[in-house]
Amino acid sequence: MSEYKDTLNLPETGFPMRGNLANREPEMLERWYKEDLYGEIRKAKKGKKSFVLHDGPPYANGDIHIGHALNKILKDIIIKSKTLSGFDAPYIPGWDCHGLPIELMVEKKVGKPGQKVTAAEFREKCREYAAGQVEGQKESFKRLGIMGEWDKPYRTMDFATEANIIRALGKIASNGHLLKGFKPVHWCTDCGSALAEAEVEYKDKVSPSIDVRFKTADEAALLSKFELTEGHEGKGDVSIVIWTTTPWTLPANRAVCLRDDLEYVLIQVEGDNPERIIVAAELAKDVMDRAGIEHFHNLGFAKGADLELSQFQHPFYDFTVPAILGDHVTTDSGTGVVHTAPGHGQEDFAVGQKYNLEVANPVGSNGVYLPDTELFAGQHVFKANDAVVETLKEKGALLHHHAYEHSYPHCWRHKTPIIFRATPQWFVSMDQAGLRAKALESIKGVQWMPEWGQSRIEGMIEGRPEWCISRQRTWGVPIALFVHKETAELHPNTLELIEKVAKLVEEKGIQAWWDVDAAELLGDEAEQYEKVLDTLDVWFDSGVTHFSVVDAREEYNGNSADLYLEGSDQHRGWFQSSLISSIAMKGVAPYKQVLTHGFVVDGHGRKMSKSIGNVVAPKDVTNKLGADILRLWVASTDYTGEVAVSDEILKRSADAYRRIRNTARFFLANLNGFNPATDIVPAEEMVALDRWAVGRALAAQEEIIKAYDEYNIHAVTQRLMQFCSIEMGSFYLDVIKDRQYTAKQGGHAQRSCQTALYYIVEALVRWMAPIMSFTADEIWNEMPGEREKFVFTGEWFDGLFGLAEGEELNNEFWTEIQKVRGAVNKLLEAARAEKTIGGALQAELTLFADDALAAKINKLEDELRFVLLTSAAAVKPLSEKSDAAQATDIEGLFVEVKATEAEKCDRCWHHTPDVGTIAGHEKICGRCVSNVDGKGEVRKFA
């Protein structure tokens, strides 16, 4: 063998078998940034059709977690695939930089504003802290191979962005959507601030469930509503009974609410302490059972509408409250009579407005009753529940009391229960200028992926209250408005004033609002107006980035966003705040498509939790396995549902990666010595099997591009794996090894094969590039021929071709041959197991086939043996089937396997009768002699 070694085409490449990604990726990253890869992409795509994926900003606090990695990698895959499809697809990453979590971190370091530091100094410390957090997260994202404007990201605290956020507020106000109101809002007593809908999460909580008597203030008038017969009016006090799980709100009670069409029953409670109570007829038995009342009977009935404006005594204060009517009253639970505190509930507030009820709020921002709150002053509301229940007992107003577990709103930061609390706030009104209706209409024009996203956001927009955009915080964009001291009206020149403030903020940041003297902007009117000192909800900051970033950044060339891509929780967060603000400002949705991914869970479907110990940190994965493994994990998952990750799942991704890498390595190693400029074989002159392989690549490419276009990333990975492992690895690459290694160096048989390998790897490297970016770059640099510096600046390979129309050895033919090969392989395996043969090249095959199949197989002529990887293979009619022939799982095909008696060729290891018959080459076969000393063997089919 050694004397012929130099005549073989041995594979050789600088592309190593092991990726060693954790060590080599940082070196590649260094080169990408040194050679300005992102800038090169931008230059290459300048003037092409635009694609804008607008980045939803993560919060600038803490290390990135696996959910961040999933989100950013998905975005990067889509951007890179769009770039390869010929789009100009800039990516400007962003960060949300204002708000409470940053304030809390800074408070730990410097104390609260106004204590050890001034508010201005505190804001500066917040800015510094957020900037440091952005830098840390930025490096983590870059390590994942994500390309973007990392030197010029957007941060909601950039002066220009802060100024544009203020301009957005002005635009919303001028379009008639801004509203000031004293309304109940979600309030966290730990934050000391209002919360947005998206900052509220629901968890189970145990509360006191109480049924409370409100005695009638006019017994005769009330009883007359029930049309009782004389002498059957019953006896004892008359009360209407409410049910509540928030006893602490009873000091703010200003009404009891019924439903107009419900039937209410007057019940006589019998026994030593007779009384009469009113509840909804439907719920009467439940109420009696709950209260343990066994002896009672009905006295009469009345509709809710008949009881409207009846007066009842507050259970522990010296005033009366009316019975009012509301649609929100149900018979799902309770008594059918709803305790109404307009200062502590949105439905209560809405119905209270109709009846002009007082919006009482006896609770301070810290959750403690105000000093003038009778009976309960100075108590925290949740601790006061017991005190309220005790007071009700003392007053004889408590009918029943038990502990009740129910879903209750909690603060997403503190994980503590929140309250509804009426405070003066600024709102984006959903209805005063038709914003809700316009938003619902615009949703229909957006493509929601998955489709259920549409009904989800529609339901949320239909049911959502006014958007409370004001916060009583220090670190935030100011609500830069002037209101009249007496009328509370906005200044008539609000839009002009906002532009003046925005220009100041562009120059000096948000501190300019607190520093500027009102007289500088208002002149003589300054005495009549006061500055609003509230800050904007951070969801407003991020929600208006369609204006403050997309419309403002020159990289987008005035194009609006094509795609928003975030986790499915953003239907109630960023998707919604963006939609509402965009409709309020421009009358159109801010996006054309909205794509969501699920949350990351562990291998058992559990949430990531430090206490469980199942947290997978992106940094740990990149340090151990490399970013391409993490990227392949993302691309292998149906991200529309929950996305599972664990060491075992990542190991599977690493195994899949190795298979793809080994396929690429085979291609590169066998392109050794190939120069595309001089060695390409024209398609019509290529060996039939090589043409077929290029055709399979074309079919795969069409499916892969379609899947990328539809954001169906896991379908890309599945098709890529199928192509590498099945179509190439299990068949084509297996068959061509013999020809590639043993054919005449530089001869037609070898160059035809190399031409196919070259075309296929040109396509393959591009399919891989959006997903396994580091590995694709590595492959690109090992490929033969002149090429651009980076795979990412090009487009999909357009040099592939399919088999010609009407070609005899078409796709159907090769599919049939693969089936035959599969059937034969089973028998060869059995022969090996029985020690009839050592390896397949020690076998001689006779295939007994029916006429149709024999005609097909015979098209390969003497090259059938190369497809079957045996030293000899003959085809005979089925009628001549020998006794030794074995059935296969193909109808009409029997195969006889026997050990060859021919000598083994030292060079190609085939056993052929002509080994030793050629003078000067006694150890090799005639085919090898031709490949070493002659013109080279001729291959037409395989």
UniProtKB/Swiss-Prot annotation:
Sorted keywords for this record are: Aminoacyl-tRNA synthetase, ATP-binding, Cytoplasm, Ligase, Metal-binding, Nucleotide-binding, Protein biosynthesis, Zinc
Q: Give the matching CDD domains.
A: Anticodon_Ia_Ile_BEm, IleRS_core
Q: What cofactor does this chain's UniProt record say it requires?
A: Zn(2+)
State where the protein is found: Cytoplasm
- Residues forming the motif 'HIGH' region are 58-68
Q: Main site of residence?
A: cytoplasm
The residues listed in the UniProt record as binding L-isoleucyl-5'-AMP, with positions renumbered to this chain, are E566
Q: Looking at the record's lineage, which domain of life comes first?
A: Bacteria
**UniProt-annotated binding residues for Zn(2+):** C905, C908, C925, C928
Q: Name one GO molecular function term.
A: tRNA binding
- Please name the GO terms of the biological process aspect recorded for this protein, alphabetically: isoleucyl-tRNA aminoacylation
Q: Which PROSITE patterns match?
A: AA_TRNA_LIGASE_I (PS00178)
Family the entry assigns: Belongs to the class-I aminoacyl-tRNA synthetase family. IleS type 1 subfamily.
Q: What does this protein do?
A: Catalyzes the attachment of isoleucine to tRNA(Ile). As IleRS can inadvertently accommodate and process structurally similar amino acids such as valine, to avoid such errors it has two additional distinct tRNA(Ile)-dependent editing activities. One activity is designated as 'pretransfer' editing and involves the hydrolysis of activated Val-AMP. The other activity is designated 'posttransfer' editing and involves deacylation of mischarged Val-tRNA(Ile).
Q: What is this protein called?
A: Isoleucine--tRNA ligase
Q: Which organism is it from?
A: Vibrio parahaemolyticus serotype O3:K6 (strain RIMD 2210633)
